[in-house]
Amino acid sequence: MYLYQYFVDLQNQLGYIQKKLTEYLLCIQQSSDVQINTRIGEKLNEPIFARDISQYAKKYIIKSDDDDRMYPLNESLILDFNYTNTTSKYYRDVIHIHGSLADPKTMIFGYGDELDENYKKLSNLNDNHYLKYIKSIRYLESGNYRDMLRFINAAPYQIYIMGHSCGNSDRTLLNTLFEHENCVSIKPFYYQKDEENDN
């Protein structure tokens, strides 16, 4: 009984944190004027260069040894892990995988490392109440995850990582993207604040 009550209390606390985070982000989003960085828009529309494609993928996709050859993008998609509308200022086709501030009920807040042993223990309890804040359970409640799968299954793709830590909280989803047979390249970007600090 104690363990069950512990999880109930923990989930209530997570619900409270989610509510406060939503209030804070709505306030920030309404009060800030996002400065558009044109270099980000340029990167999003770049073709895929042969030199960026993994050696594994080159065996199946490229029949040329020309590393400077470019492959134009047939389709682009932003998979946004943020709740705000910032990415929609750069691009029209955006999947808010964790939901959006535009509809706070869709927001997915929690943890998503199904590869962790503790997840397996919770799952084996056969009580979905324990899984309320597990992201992959919530992904099934919207079409966003299915839309993402449809995109990555359709054709070879390149991933640009901007502003994401690639931490454990999204480990399972990132594993799906990074290890997919259509993923030909992963390019992480970071923001250089000054000579000593980056983000």
Where do the protein language model's features map onto the residues?
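Extended, H/D-rich, highly charged conserved domains that either
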Residues: 1-142
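A near-ubiquitous, low-amplitude feature marking generic local secondary-structure context
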Residues: 131, 135, 145, 156-160
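A short, well-structured beta->alpha microelement
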Residues: 140-150
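SIR2/sirtuin-family catalytic core signature
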Residues: 148-199
